[in-house]
């Protein structure tokens, strides 16, 4: 839960500042490098401003992706793995889709993958 919270907090903060999409794991060029300019060179002494907080995603290790003003992340809800679509700027849940049962193992429960956005389609596989 903490991992998802801090990951979303980080991406929500970053994507509030930049305009580019990050439509899949490791970004648009599959290399983990943002081509955006004008980014902060250091965090403010009080840390980054929290843009929004989501407590409805549950557990998991999914990396969020951002495309077209929407943030997609996988988590758990009602005993199932879910794909959550949220407004990137405000965090409002737009929709959810059930992916299947929750993966339970010795390495931590919940989904591990990241969704991929291609045009107007979103692809996601559960853990």
Where are these regions (language model features)?
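Sec-dependent N-terminal signal peptides
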Residues: 4-13
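Noncatalytic, solvent-exposed loop/strand surfaces
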Residues: 19-127
């Amino acid at each position: 839960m903490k991992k998802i919270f801090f990951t979303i907090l980080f991406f929500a903060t970053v994507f509030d500042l930049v305009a580019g999409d990050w439509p899949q794991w490791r970004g648009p060029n599959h290399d983990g490098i943002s081509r955006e300019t004008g980014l902060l060179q250091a965090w403010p002494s009080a840390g980054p401003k929290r843009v929004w907080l989501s407590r409805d995603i549950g557990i998991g290790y999914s990396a969020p992706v951002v495309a077209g003003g929407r943030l997609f992340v996988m988590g758990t809800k009602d005993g199932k793995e879910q794909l959550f679509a949220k407004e990137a700027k405000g965090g409002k849940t737009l929709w959810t889709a059930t992916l299947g049962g929750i993966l339970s193992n010795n390495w931590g429960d919940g989904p591990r993958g990241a969704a991929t956005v291609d045009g107007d389609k979103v692809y996601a596989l559960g853990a």
